[in-house]
Amino acid sequence: MKVSEAALSLLVLILIITSASRSQPKVPEWVNTPSTCCLKYYEKVLPRRLVVGYRKALNCHLPAIIFVTKRNREVCTNPNDDWVQEYIKDPNLPLLPTRNLSTVKIITAKNGQPQLLNSQ
């Protein structure tokens, strides 16, 4: 009898916790959520002809310049690299608005090309 009462109590507790966590309101759109941050840098020089714009992610744990390619891929780069500095000084390369996302994107080299591994 004590075992079934304990099991029933545990089940009720789990249901209460689960329903409470599901009823939590989502964060309103106007709340400033973390912008896209990078976990590591793309190590190679990205061909300039592939880049259509860039974003800054400088307030992250790993500061980065995120280049956006013609295929709408985002490539995390080291803002201290000479080639990155050269690209962002190009007046024909627009600074794009920061995206407010709580996700982290990881870019790595695969077959010499940038590859998006995790996008949302």
Curated annotation (Swiss-Prot):
**SMART domains listed in its UniProt record:** SCY
Q: Which residues form the signal peptide?
A: 1-23
Instruction: Kindly list the GO molecular function terms attached to this UniProt entry.
Output: CCR chemokine receptor binding; chemoattractant activity; chemokine activity
Q: Which domain of life is it from?
A: Eukaryota
Q: Which Pfam families match?
A: IL8
The cellular location(s) given in this protein's UniProt record come to: Secreted
Cysteines engaged in disulfide bonds, as pairs: C37-C60, C38-C76
Q: Which GO terms describe its biological process?
A: antimicrobial humoral immune response mediated by antimicrobial peptide; cell communication; cell-cell signaling; chemokine-mediated signaling pathway; chemotaxis; eosinophil chemotaxis; inflammatory response; positive regulation of cell migration
Q: Which CDD domains match?
A: Chemokine_CC (cd00272)
Q: Name one GO cellular component term.
A: extracellular region
Keywords of the record, alphabetical order, are: Chemotaxis, Cytokine, Disulfide bond, Inflammatory response, Secreted, Signal
> What drives induction of this protein's expression?
By IL10/interleukin-10.
UniProt key word Disulfide bond: yes
Q: In which tissues is it expressed?
A: Mainly expressed in liver, also found in spleen and thymus. Highly expressed in LPS- and IFN-gamma-activated monocytes, weakly in some lymphocytes, including natural killer cells, gamma-delta T-cells, and some T-cell clones.
Q: Which InterPro entries match?
A: Chemokine_b/g/d, Chemokine_CC_CS, Chemokine_IL8-like_dom, Interleukin_8-like_sf
Q: Which family does it belong to?
A: Belongs to the intercrine beta (chemokine CC) family.
Q: What does this protein do?
A: Shows chemotactic activity for lymphocytes and monocytes but not neutrophils. Also shows potent myelosuppressive activity, suppresses proliferation of myeloid progenitor cells. Recombinant SCYA16 shows chemotactic activity for monocytes and THP-1 monocytes, but not for resting lymphocytes and neutrophils. Induces a calcium flux in THP-1 cells that were desensitized by prior expression to RANTES.
State the PANTHER family in the record: C-C MOTIF CHEMOKINE 16 (PTHR12015:SF21), SMALL INDUCIBLE CYTOKINE A (PTHR12015)
Kindly provide the name given to this protein in its UniProt entry.
C-C motif chemokine 16
